Amino acid sequence: MTRRPRLLTTAAAGATAALLLTACGGGTNDTKSNDKIDGAETASATTATSTTPPRPSAHRPRIELPSDLSYAFDWSKTGDADKDAVLSDSEQSIKAVDLAIVNQNALDKAYLYYYEGEAAVGTQKFIQTYVDNKASVTGAYRFYDPQVSVDKGGTASLSYCEDQGKAYVKYLKTNEVKRTEVTAKSYVSYHTSLKKNSKGVWVIQKIVSQSGSAQCQP
């Protein structure tokens, strides 16, 4: 399952495939390799209310995104070290997927650092759709209403909402941005299952998303 619902879809027109780039609803125009994952397994504007930055001891990848992408994580520290670590690594995993899209690399090392198994396979396919269509992402993303729980066995779950109302698809060849109207589908819920690996990193093993989720509506 992908990190967020596909912003990119393909429709057939006769024998020719016509690309329809959308971001959760209808909109107007403005002038994601088939390789298998091993084990299959700043310009960026940062958050106004972000959790602590990732711990450097695990040598987490440096994620630098272009200035046309911004993120707001409306989830504050919980006061619990494990829960805060889950939130922090989840922030980076979200940005890492967009970095792979920006880099046009479905096997980008940064996101593979945070995803494994089923989640990695689904995310690779999601990124490859953008790569195949020479498309990227632009705009502003907001994440809110986190619900995190940590088990003693080194596993955790995180549910949260995403506001995609100001996030768009961008064609790389023409630099055209597909601007879309904000609809109920612009609000997406996510449910992730994570595991703490040997490096102390909370990696995502499963992820389920629902666009238009009632619990995420403003």
For each of these PLM feature ranges, what is it?
Residues M1-R4:
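N-terminal secretory signal peptides that target proteins for export/translocation
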Residues L7-L8, A12-A15, C24-T52:
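Short, low-complexity, disordered segments immediately C-terminal to signal peptides
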Residues D30-T31, A43, A72, F143, ...:
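Intrinsically disordered, low-complexity, compositionally biased regions/tails
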Residues A40-S70:
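Acidic, low-complexity proline/glycine-rich segments
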Residues P61-S136:
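Core segments of small alpha/beta cavity-forming domains
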Residues A106-K109, Y113-P218:
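Structured, amphipathic secondary-structure segments that form assembly/contact surfaces
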